[in-house]
A protein has these predicted regions:
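Amphipathic, oligomerization/interface secondary-structure segments
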Residues: 1-178
Length: 178
């Protein structure tokens, strides 16, 4: 439990900055498109709808989708081929496990690390990781997806190596020598 959450926190540390960097780039791109005009109402309405869809307002502050921020973090720092190789070296059954088995206690979907569409792989990976994390930390009575200590440990143990190698790549990708 603690290992998974600790590795998740490595990625979570970068969520806000990566999410806002992505929004800023997308806004700049939309504003500088040749077909965009700040004088055309339909262009502005479309632009506003885009912004509203990308962010949430809660308690008078701007928030974002944590799962989207996780996906963006993975896209920025994770080399899927390297991740697959590291997981295979650790346990050569895990890559096929991730692609064929859901995380039953969380509803975490399959994630085919060998899939041809990197965007789809990162989305599936983010969903699997995020749903698993949520089932672990939001284990209210009555919730469908929740982690049960001891009972679900044998399932969680298969998710830890993936989180470890992801955390390691993020740490290496964000490190600098002074």
């Amino acid at each position: 439990f603690l290992q998974y959450i600790s590795y998740y926190h490595v990625a979570e540390h970068f969520f806000e900055s990566i999410f806002w960097d992505d929004i800023v780039l997308r806004v700049k791109d939309r504003l500088t498109q040749p077909g965009f005009s700040y004088k055309r109402k339909k262009d502005l309405v479309s632009f506003i709808k885009y912004i509203v869809k990308a962010i949430d307002v809660r308690d008078e502050s701007l928030t974002f989708s944590e799962q989207t921020a996780l996906r963006l973090t993975l896209e920025k720092y994770i080399d899927l081929n390297r991740l697959k190789a590291e997981i295979d070296e650790y346990d050569d059954s895990l890559v096929s496990h991730y692609s064929s088995a859901i995380v039953s206690f969380s509803g975490g979907n399959t994630a085919d690390l060998q899939g041809p569409d990197q965007g789809a792989v990162f989305s599936a990976l983010a969903a699997r990781i995020y749903k698993t994390r949520c089932a672990m930390v939001h284990s209210k009575d009555g919730e469908k997806a929740r982690y049960m200590p001891f009972k679900d440990d044998h399932l969680l143990v298969k998710e830890i190596p993936m989180m470890r190698f992801i955390a390691e790549q993020i740490i290496i990708g964000t490190s600098s020598i002074y």
